């Protein structure tokens, strides 16, 4: 069993061992306190213009055009090399502190759901600003304030927090792979599940044989990665290697990238543990007194800074030149034999057995003092693990290979959550990488509105049904994740492995649709005398739009679904199957698709999916109702299809769900299904899942459903469905972005 108390008292990579915050028990009760299992829709209503102090038409990309990036870089270098008395720089250089800040901002990214990362500047807000692993990074951000003040909205906090670390490496002699700006700020914290624990450094996220719960990547609450003293504070390098491999894999890093990142990260800087945190270190920023003005971890030991700093229970530097890029980390790791020791704070770390290592490392604040190098348990993992060891030795023998591997892995770490390369800004954007899911540029003339109308008629006359067209377009577009901006219809990767074989996409049905659409594509492109072409990606979306128009026509509404050509088709060689599989939905409530092994309830999975698709609660509501009427359920199930006219875009889902003549009960045959019983006849009228019934049971969702169920809600339902559908179809179309809230789209008349 993990000794949590011991872990809390001494452990982290750069986190103080401090007590967990004490909950305030006298605060007013919220609905969540009374009904903890209630579906919380607030996650769908964050980051609106109501929380943003900037004008609604503010466009960060436009503001960035006025930024002198070279001047900003020089200002950063000047700042890094000018030590300030209120928080002295180790070795006279803040570079390592800024690298840790950037690393910890980006390093919260997890590949399972794309959440975390540095793309929004979330390190400024709770809980991340007060995580024990982020201790004293409040000072790093405060050091940056004069530059943020100087450049204003031309550079976002999100970009500045990441760029500072990149510049820091360059200032210490390392040639980085490049850098992309383009991270707009948000103004409130993201509501993310960081783990089940209610204490700092708790590790209730494990079960069985140290199996880490999904989607989590870090090993303990409040750590960015792993415990540097080893699992649960146990200084076992091989056991630590297992944690490292699992955690970094869940951050989308392979073994070589992992070794390079750890080596490169520990080539500069030092850890801080001049004394035990208990009795010396104060509250984190969110709990600190108001007069501290957002700074936390006030230290009463000695001067409280410099040589007396307490950030971790660990103390010491890894290399002989802690502000210079070199191969010193690996040289020391392999040169010396290491023995277990403790820091002044009592943390478990390692020192050389070799006496010649004494006095080889300069003191961070006193020229007359010297030290021996220090290694952490997780550092020794790189030497002792049978997989990491040979990689580290190769890097030791070939420093140029380390530099290349670290440059690319560092770039990947900083940009993993930014999505396609087209979102990057600035002059230092390198060539496309496979992990960016590259999509070819448009190299042909796009179809006209007349072509679009003709193609829609051809699609609707091809024998493909409305449900088939809707399901295919939705499967392509709704693979998008607003967290790390991956997925979407652009690229037509739904026709490629692994997406074409996902159970959620019904492979045999999908193959039929794709074959028909490819035939239409070939016929159209082959008939053009000029350079005009239509991509399969565009046809997939256009087919869905045509199907929506046809279903609306059947309901008596002559509507036009916006469509903007310009998507292109990616190749299998441009698709990394190993990292693309994480986009496969565990469940898709919009199509009433769920897996038995899913730990989340259908209604919770619905909320999670809506959050990934950047939908509001009204948009989520109207899409579910519309998808049911379009008969787009997975496996053509009838659950939630409350109509005798499937394929017609009517508001009957809401009308019949809210019909007080129907009583609902759990099905005896299937516990995941509910039966709607006619109160008069006792006969079964409908079947549904929890993802359907939640719109009648949840008070907020019922209020939304009532709007569309009203007699005057029919046209509103169709109009709002089309708007929400268009949003989903274009979530990945960054080429269409005008202002922050606007998109340009070519509209076409319905058939």
From Swiss-Prot:
Reaction(s) this enzyme catalyzes, per UniProt: H2O2 + AH2 = A + 2 H2O; 2 H2O2 = O2 + 2 H2O
Query: Per the database entry, which stretches of residues form a coiled coil?
Result: none
Identify the keywords attached in UniProt to this record, alphabetized: Heme, Hydrogen peroxide, Iron, Metal-binding, Oxidoreductase, Peroxidase
InterPro entries, per the entry: Catalase_peroxidase, Haem_peroxidase, Haem_peroxidase_sf, Peroxidases_AS, Peroxidases_heam-ligand_BS
Q: What class of enzyme is it?
A: oxidoreductase
Q: Which Gene3D superfamilies match?
A: 1.10.520.10, Peroxidase, domain 2
| Residues the entry annotates as binding heme b | 266
The family assignment reads: Belongs to the peroxidase family. Peroxidase/catalase subfamily.
Q: Which cofactor does it need?
A: heme b
Tell me where the cross-link Tryptophyl-tyrosyl-methioninium (Trp-Tyr) (with M-251) is found: 103-225
Stretches of Basic and acidic residues bias are at 1-11
Spans annotated as Disordered: 1-31, 345-375
* Stated role: Bifunctional enzyme with both catalase and broad-spectrum peroxidase activity.
Covalent cross-link (Tryptophyl-tyrosyl-methioninium (Tyr-Met) (with W-103)), residues:
225-251
Q: Which organism's genome codes for this protein? A: Cupriavidus pinatubonensis (strain JMP 134 / LMG 1197) (Cupriavidus necator (strain JMP 134))
Organism's domain of life? Bacteria
Query: Residues at site: Transition state stabilizer?
Result: 100
The GO terms describing molecular function are: catalase activity; heme binding; metal ion binding
| Name of the featured protein | Catalase-peroxidase 1
EC number in record? 1.11.1.21
The protein's matches in Pfam families, at most eight in alphabetical order, are given as:
peroxidase
The UniProt note on the cofactor reads as follows: Binds 1 heme b (iron(II)-protoporphyrin IX) group per dimer.
Gene Ontology BP annotations = cellular response to hydrogen peroxide; hydrogen peroxide catabolic process
Task: State whether it acts alone or in a complex, and with which partners, per the record.
Answer: Homodimer or homotetramer.
Alphabetical GO CC annotations of the entry are: cytosol
Q: Could you tell me which PANTHER family the record lists for this protein?
A: CATALASE-PEROXIDASE, HYDROPEROXIDASE I, BIFUNCTIONAL CATALASE-PEROXIDASE
Q: Where is the active site?
A: 104 (proton acceptor)
């Amino acid at each position: 069993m993990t000794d949590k108390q011991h872990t809390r008292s001494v452990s982290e990579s750069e986190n103080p061992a401090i007590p967990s915050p004490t909950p305030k028990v006298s605060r007013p009760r919220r609905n969540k306190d009374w009904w903890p299992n209630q579906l919380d829709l607030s996650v769908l209503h964050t980051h609106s213009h109501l929380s943003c102090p900037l004008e609604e038409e503010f466009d960060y990309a436009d503001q960035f055009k006025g930024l002198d990036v070279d001047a900003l870089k020089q200002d950063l270098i000047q700042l890094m090399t000018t030590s300030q008395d209120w928080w002295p720089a180790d070795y006279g250089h803040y570079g390592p502190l800024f690298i840790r800040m950037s690393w910890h901002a980006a390093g919260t990214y997890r590949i399972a759901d794309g959440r975390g990362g540095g793309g929004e500047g979330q390190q400024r807000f709770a809980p991340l600003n007060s995580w024990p692993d982020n201790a004293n990074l409040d000072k790093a951000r405060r050091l940056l304030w004069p530059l943020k003040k100087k450049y204003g909205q031309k550079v976002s906090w999100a970009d500045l927090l990441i760029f500072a670390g990149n510049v820091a490496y360059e200032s210490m002699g390392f040639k980085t792979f490049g850098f992309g700006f383009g991270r707009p700020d948000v103004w409130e914290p993201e509501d993310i599940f960081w783990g089940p624990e209610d204490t700092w450094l708790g590790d209730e996220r494990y079960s069985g044989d140290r199996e880490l719960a999904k989607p989590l990547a870090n090993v303990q609450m409040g750590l960015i990665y792993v415990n540097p003293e080893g699992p649960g504070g146990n200084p076992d390098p091989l056991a630590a290697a297992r944690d490292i491999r699992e955690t970094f894999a869940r951050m989308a890093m392979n073994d070589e990238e992992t070794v390079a990142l750890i080596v490169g990260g520990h080539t500069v800087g030092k850890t801080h543990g001049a004394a035990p945190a208990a009795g010396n270190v104060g509250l984190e920023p969110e709990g600190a007194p108001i007069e501290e003005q957002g700074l936390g971890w006030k230290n009463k030991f000695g001067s409280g800074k410099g040589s007396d700093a307490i950030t971790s229970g660990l103390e010491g530097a890894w290399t002989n030149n802690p502000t210079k890029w070199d191969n010193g980390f690996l040289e020391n790791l392999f040169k010396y034999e290491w023995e277990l020791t403790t820091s002044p704070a009592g943390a478990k770390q390692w020192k050389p057995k070799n006496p010649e290592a004494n006095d080889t490392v300069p003191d961070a604040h006193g020229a007359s003092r010297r030290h021996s190098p220090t290694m952490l348990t997780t550092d020794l993992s790189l030497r002792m693990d049978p997989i990491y060891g040979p990689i580290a030795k190769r890097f030791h023998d070939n420093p140029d290979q380390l530099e290349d591997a670290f440059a690319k892995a560092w770039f990947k770490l900083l940009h993993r959550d930014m999505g396609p390369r087209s979102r990057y800004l600035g002059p230092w954007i390198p060539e496309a990488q496979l992990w960016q899911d590259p999509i070819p540029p448009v190299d042909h003339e796009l179809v006209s509105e007349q072509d679009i109308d003709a193609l829609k008629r051809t699609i609707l006359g091809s024998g493909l049904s409305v449900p088939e067209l809707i399901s295919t377009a939705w499967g392509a577009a709704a693979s998008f994740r607003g967290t790390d901006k991956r997925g979407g219809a652009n690229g037509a990767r739904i026709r490629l492995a692994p997406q074409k074989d996902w159970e959620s996409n019904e492979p045999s049905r999908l193959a039929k649709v794709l074959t028909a659409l490819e035939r239409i594509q070939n016929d159209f492109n082959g008939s053009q005398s000029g350079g005009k072409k239509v991509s399969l990606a565009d046809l997939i979306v256009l087919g869905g739009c045509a199907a929506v128009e046809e279903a609306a026509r059947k309901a008596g509404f002559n509507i036009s679904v916006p469509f903007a050509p310009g998507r292109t088709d990616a190749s299998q060689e441009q698709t990394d199957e190993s990292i693309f599989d994480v986009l496969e939905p565990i469940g898709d409530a919009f199509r009433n698709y769920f897996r038995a092994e899913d730990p989340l309830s259908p209604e919770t999975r619905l909320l999670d999916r809506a959050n990934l698709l950047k939908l509001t609660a009204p948009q989520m509501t109207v899409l579910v109702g519309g998808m049911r009427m379009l008969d787009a359920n997975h496996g053509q199930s009838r659950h939630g299809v409350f109509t005798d006219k499937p394929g017609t875009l009517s508001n009957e889902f809401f009308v019949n769900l809210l019909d007080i003549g129907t009583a609902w009960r759990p099905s005896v045959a299937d516990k995941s299904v509910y039966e709607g019983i006619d109160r008069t006849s006792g006969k079964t009228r409908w079947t549904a899942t929890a993802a359907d019934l939640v719109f009648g049971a949840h008070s907020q969702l019922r209020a939304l459903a009532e709007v569309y169920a009203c007699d005057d809600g029919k046209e509103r339902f169709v109009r709002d469905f089309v708007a929400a559908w268009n949003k989903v179809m274009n979530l990945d179309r960054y080429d269409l972005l005008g202002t922050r809230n606007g998109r340009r789209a070519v509209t076409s008349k319905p058939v």
